[in-house]
Amino acid sequence: MASCSFTRDQATRRLRGAAAAAAAALAAVVTTPLLSSGTPTALIGTGSSCPGAMWLSTATGSRSDSESEEEDLPVGEEVCKRGYLRKQKHGHRRYFVLKLETADAPARLEYYENARKFRHSVRAAAAAAAAAASGAAIPPLIPPRRVITLYQCFSVSQRADARYRHLIALFTQDEYFAMVAENESEQESWYLLLSRLILESKRRRCGTLGAQPDGEPAALAAAAAAEPPFYKDVWQVIVKPRGLGHRKELSGVFRLCLTDEEVVFVRLNTEVASVVVQLLSIRRCGHSEQYFFLEVGRSTVIGPGELWMQVDDCVVAQNMHELFLEKMRALCADEYRARCRSYSISIGAHLLTLLSARRHLGLVPLEPGGWLRRSRFEQFCHLRAIGDGEDEMLFTRRFVTPSEPVAHSRRGRLHLPRGRRSRRAVSVPASFFRRLAPSPARPRHPAEAPNNGARLSSEVSGSGSGNFGEEGNPQGKEDQEGSGGDYMPMNNWGSGNGRGSGGGQGSNGQGSSSHSSGGNQCSGEGQGSRGGQGSNGQGSGGNQCSRDGQGTAGGHGSGGGQRPGGGHGSGGGQGPGDGHGSGGGKNSGGGKGSGSGKGSDGDGERGKSLKKRSYFGKLTQSKQQQMPPPPPPPPPPPPAGGTGGKGKSGGRFRLYFCVDRGATKECKEAKEVKDAEIPEGAARGPHRARAFDEDEDDPYVPMRPGVATPLVSSSDYMPMAPQNVSASKKRHSRSPFEDSRGYMMMFPRVSPPPAPSPPKAPDTNKEDDSKDNDSESDYMFMAPGAGAIPKNPRNPQGGSSSKSWSSYFSLPNPFRSSPLGQNDNSEYVPMLPGKFLGRGLDKEVSYNWDPKDAASKPSGEGSFSKPGDGGSPSKPSDHEPPKNKAKRPNRLSFITKGYKIKPKPQKPTHEQREADSSSDYVNMDFTKRESNTPAPSTQGLPDSWGIIAEPRQSAFSNYVNVEFGVPFPNPANDLSDLLRAIPRANPLSLDSARWPLPPLPLSATGSNAIEEEGDYIEVIFNSAMTPAMALADSAIRYDAETGRIYVVDPFSECCMDISLSPSRCSEPPPVARLLQEEEQERRRPQSRSQSFFAAARAAVSAFPTDSLERDLSPSSAPAVASAAEPTLALSQVVAAASALAAAPGIGAAAAAAGFDSASARWFQPVANAADAEAVRGAQDVAGGSNPGAHNPSANLARGDNQAGGAAAAAAAPEPPPRSRRVPRPPEREDSDNDDDTHVRMDFARRDNQFDSPKRGR
């Protein structure tokens, strides 16, 4: 008994000692820091570390009721926090214990089924420790239900879902474990402890815990790189396989991590980011039910597209959406605008897209899943006040409302989201421009109410950043100097057709500094009492508002709030005060910045434009200081723009024109009559906020060529200005530029280029001259129609007119008949013997042309009349002599190119230019049918070749002088073709035509043949004044079966059908007939000239037809090689075929040479001029026009000159045996099934005339 009691007392004392030790350890925990001191833990997104007091109170207090029951329970020094939490999945209540890291165990989170299990676990642990100390048997321990090692966790986050409001989401390596707290304080407590323990555990594992980096930047950067990743806002999402998730193979389970500047996608079981997306690269985000989506831009590593993610429920998706928007707004508030370099075009383009998207917001397309997208920034964006910084505006879908004031650092900035591109002008309320008007140095006039209900409209339809001069306010210069970087203050931008704010004018009547010649001016509301700017008016032609006769563009103000004395603007923009309205800045849309910022003293320095970075990477420097003097005599002040600064933009901007779709002609006429009835000096009442008037829903602005000084080099760029028609001139029912159907007729602009000058070295300051104004531009700059073509073009510098006319003549005939004064409906193209037109004014190397044609070289091909000539474009006159008429292109160039079809012609090299200078041309001159055309003359032509010219006196005559200057002894030289064709035609030319060709067989070319570079041939119909401009490849089609070349205008229903055969399949094309005759030619001994034409036929045989299966016999190669003559290139053959189609008289020469003029029409070279006279006498040839004749030599003697005909017949060789003829079927009306207008050129017709155009069925 005594021994038993002694043993029991000893165990009791041992237990008491253990309890005392546990109490001491607990006291030590209370009085000492729980965690080792180190670098403060900064949570990403918070910027602050966890307070140490929270640790102290959390470790000792904040216990639940279950903990208070067992306060005397020794839990050990490693327990940091314990309490009841619920599991998210099923809502089961579990007892969670957070333990610190010890020497034998890492930091961990454990949970038990209840507190009683935890107590038993603690007692079992104590008993095990005692047993281990005494050497007794160790009782079994009670393990927890789960242990989560914290250093292996990815992150922890707070959130809420549809069921629970206070969630603690713990992300392990491979799963997502969420706990539910009872209240917000409990949630915050657990989150702070977990986040700090996770981060310190990771640091300890990485060896960075307690490391104090030096102050050196390299050490700080190294420490930051070694810092383990930790994210505050994390969601586990399932990326759906749609959009980018499908294209980039991003579908699956990801951790979506949001920081202050970026979004990171991390896969399971790793901490390395898979995709990193900058927040500024996100175009929009939204949610629908349990789906959250992001639309990213092209600056991301995965490219543009959408990412659709599935989350727990709709509440989580909504919270994600709100948090993303909050981060985006924070970036905007912190002036983080790196995206300006990535895809924002300019401030003006931002405003354009924002305003234009207003009309289309009601038609938001559905997403692939069927949900509507929520626009970024909750479908609104911040518009900061530009000059005064009074308040901020939130530009919503339908209205503009003021918001909270903004900091001074945000003043002068405009941040707009990227929206859809649209070129339609829309209107905004007056409050928008009232807040945009900079007026820091000007007090508000007492008579001006803060809200006068005035509506301002702004037409902004350009796509670039125009630059304007500074206003007269003292702070304008400071605003420009202080706004560096990627931003452009609103008082410096202009876009295309107008400027939205004209604020900052003083009270001394100075000129407007914000008018752009492309459109209307809308000035701010708070002008001075004597300011010359209309506060809310608008020019009816899209021009300057005016209050005191200040309209720089001549347009009368039409808005409310004008002074009674205002109204019609002075012609040059001169204000009644002392401010110029015609100086300064530049407009991106293609006009002069008229009235752009001359101060009261006319200081030109204020007109300097501040250049900013834009989407196109660069903008040209202002050239208004480099303006050349105007040519004598100087024109009067123009009504459409100032004389300072070139209206040229950078980056190859396009010139857009609005299309009048909505308003009818009756509405226009009624509007014109109504505007004409209003007196000029009367003030008009406020109108509703439309772009132009309340009757028209379409903001159409008639355009005309702007006033510009001659450019340094000839250019395709045309400064444009609105067609300003005053009220007294608007009584006519229709614009002079509209045709009978109500369409605005646009024609290529013509501005006089400077005189010929030698090429200059490239100037680095004028790099845009070579890019924006190069002749290889893809765009043809247009001007409105009929009246713009002068009857007597003036060119004070003696140079030729613009090169853009060749692009105009490539248009279909219905688009070119009206402005030239041709009232007939004939599609026939008469021609006149042409002249060479030099290329000295072009940027290309001029080719060698005959000096005797210099006298006949025209000085210009037509140009628009300058406004200085009377202020209105002149009209053509049918009674003027032909020398005063607008000339037409007179050269058709046939060139062969290489293997590939190039979509855009490159600039020719020096070798290519030298090769082109000696290439073969067909010169045509187009003139009126009534003109008296002299017969073609053969004087001065080479004696080595005869000229066959037979001018027949009929409506379709005046044929052709054709000269083949073929240097037989020198195969290196090309042929020189000169085709002078019949008069009176609508010119029909093609910019470019390409079709594939098989390679030319060696047996057909001979040893001295000119080798072609590839399998393609390029036929270019082009003016001598204009380099080649490629059409779309799909616009030219060749049908090998029918032998037709279809030239289809992609913008109309017109089509030109150049037929090489009379029918589809019944008769072989001319090339096939040539191949049939070639069999006969091979059996005959070939003379020098005949071998030449045999080689020509062999070259033509490369043309793609159905007869290409025939292989040329090698027997013709030795004959060709022995002749030592170059083969007739396909360009010459096509030129010859074109000539024969228009000149049936040359068929006599072909018949005299022994060829069938109906099946194969070729030229017969003659020895000298006498032989040419002999051949001219042969008009009717049995082998050609008379198929039944069997004696061509006898028929040759029936001409006018019997002796010459006999001589030619005696010298002519025997004709070859006639091949099998295929009967010509009758022409069918419904041969073409398309409903297009065809101009059919049949090279196989016997009557050698064109078919009249007919409408296909």
From Swiss-Prot:
It is a peripheral membrane protein. Residues 406-653, 678-921, 1179-1257 are annotated as: Disordered. It comes from the Eukaryota. Changing Y700F: No effect. Reduces interaction with CRK by 50%. Abolishes interaction with CRK. The modification Phosphotyrosine is found at Y921. One of its GO terms (molecular function) is phosphatidylinositol 3-kinase binding. Residues 495-509, 525-542, 551-599, 641-650 have a biased composition (Gly residues). Residues 678-800 are annotated as: CRK-binding. Residues 763-774, 840-855, 1236-1257 have a biased composition (Basic and acidic residues). InterPro entries: IRS (IPR039011), IRS_PTB (IPR002404), PH-like_dom_sf (IPR011993), PH_domain (IPR001849). A motif (YXXM motif 3) lies at residues 717-720. Pfam families: IRS (PF02174). A motif (YXXM motif 4) lies at residues 743-746. It is found in: Cell membrane. Residues 510-524, 800-810 have a biased composition (Low complexity). A motif (YXXM motif 7) lies at residues 921-924. Residues 78-199 form the PH domain. GO terms for biological process: insulin receptor signaling pathway; signal transduction. Interacts with SOCS6 in response to stimulation with either insulin or IGF1. Interacts with CRK and CRKL. Interaction with CRK is stronger than with CRKL. Interacts with CRK via the phosphorylated YXXM motifs. Interacts with GRB2 and PIK3R1. Interacts with PLC-gamma, SHC1, PTK6, PPP4C and NISCH. Interacts with ASB4; this interaction promotes IRS4 proteasomal degradation. Acts as an interface between multiple growth factor receptors possessing tyrosine kinase activity, such as insulin receptor, IGF1R and FGFR1, and a complex network of intracellular signaling molecules containing SH2 domains. Involved in the IGF1R mitogenic signaling pathway. Promotes the AKT1 signaling pathway and BAD phosphorylation during insulin stimulation without activation of RPS6KB1 or the inhibition of apoptosis. Interaction with GRB2 enhances insulin-stimulated mitogen-activated protein kinase activity. May be involved in nonreceptor tyrosine kinase signaling in myoblasts. This is Insulin receptor substrate 4. It comes from Homo sapiens.
